[in-house]
């Protein structure tokens, strides 16, 4: 039984003399015309198979049926456009992908008559087509002797490339050669699939300047595939393959616009269902487009070795490639566009292994084959069948291929830049929403004047603190951060600002000898963190305002120091009296209201000094740049929102708020791992004070305190117990 099967298989391999004496030749067709008819029939089968969504295995099987059929029958008796649909209809059933007869007829009509409308299924013409196709199918079956199982060279290509551990580029190139051998040559009628596979691998090696080494036992790689193969046979068939490519008509080298049609159909379907995925799909499309451009660029480039080639390609020797790729891709590209080889049918013996090795090449090459090869339509011209060496072939097309390579590289660069731009936009759009919003009501919210304040709507702080977890936020330097606080106040508020400046000056003088300094002790915890971290110029806060003292020191450890925002906004309100605020902590804290000359102050932070750099906290602040006239400085995501800020905060019950503030600050410091300790007392930072109110007398008094800091007074009464920590 096995011997009988081998004899039957030999029946379908023909010598050159038999090919030259085929039925079509006997009916008057010249050799080139017959080969052209075979190529056009294979082209039609490829197009129909893609439209019917059958696997490439099914299409290849139908092409072999067609080649064998025309070794028994003539093209003059059975037109290729009639045989092709019947062969595909039969192959689909053999490969377990049956298609409805109606669909096959409609697809064939669309491919052959794209301008005409589809026939009515009840019309006489349609019924006649159905009858003709069924009859042709039975004729093909009888002509083939019901030998329907086909062995393809692809199986052997994959096995051999795996055996010799060939590079991915070499495997892909060899695989495409096997497909093109079916489309463009009669090798399937002359040589067994293992021999054809060796020819394809040999041609791919020449193409990519790659040489498969001899095995350890001294055998060449092709001896493991087929013992009858010799190097002379491989060179002869490679030369014949190149000659066929050289004289293949240009119209068969063009890529059918299958990808555009498929993309248009997919776009319509996607529009019905998935608008929400549009942005993600755009990025994915750009990525796939970029990868396909890279592949095509690799195909068109001359590489020294396929192992060093960076892109999957039909590597490089563009010489032979220009022609071969034209037609080769005519077949491989077009079928890949609609059949990414993910569909592996149970009966697809060779495709299961092919998919593992070559799915990347198939999918990437499917996408932009048309761009690469439409431009090659004029590259090769029909020439007499004189022998052309591989070097001559390369030299002939080197210039054209260099131009195509440049064009494809430009296209690849454009696609990559578009992808980068789109990705950057998505990332920036995402980052713009990753912020934490803190609404901080400023004291005076229980002020009797609240109805008036609610009219102004904009005197509470709403701060948007950018998240520091991302790379962008982490890379921002403190000195690059500017702050903007825009306080919209009425005219009477500016009057109150001036009053507060005067009161603060008087209060500072009184406060130096004030007997109730025991409140210093309570404020030490709340001021410790901000004093130790902020530069000298940032110490001018209204620390007597309990809310501000807590908020300033709570946020002082962040790279975006928000303390300036509180000094600016607090300066727009009158200074509370010492007995109401619990006696402000340090002398420098009483100077805060001097910043009220403008509703905001523009400055950028220098690198934060350490405690060692701040002896007595009166160090030089020349590193700070103040710009008094600027009233619109910028702070990231900081807004002013509703909620009241009292123009007069005298009547607010401050004792409870103050204690709550101290407790909250201590809990936050403990959470950060900082143990609050008493810092050395110091005078207010003189640089900023002189900037607002230059006085000669202040210099002498400060100079004495700089070197010898004054110790803080002891509390006259113990602090009250702390309430539980806030959640």
UniProtKB/Swiss-Prot annotation:
The modification N6-acetyllysine is found at residue 391. The modification ADP-ribosylserine is found at residues 417, 475, 532, 550, 553, 564. Residues 711-727 have a biased composition (Pro residues). The modification ADP-ribosylhistidine is found at residues 488, 531, 557. Keywords: Acetylation, ADP-ribosylation, Cell cycle, Cell division, Coiled coil, Cyclin, Host-virus interaction, Isopeptide bond, Nucleus, Phosphoprotein, Transcription, Transcription regulation, Ubl conjugation. Residues 508-531 have a biased composition (Basic residues). A motif (Nuclear localization signal) lies at residues 253-270. There is a cross-link at residues 343, 416, 482 (Glycyl lysine isopeptide (Lys-Gly) (interchain with G-Cter in SUMO2)). The modification Phosphoserine is found at residues 117, 389, 496, 500, 565. Belongs to the cyclin family. Cyclin C subfamily. This is Cyclin-T1. It comes from Bos taurus. The gene is CCNT1.
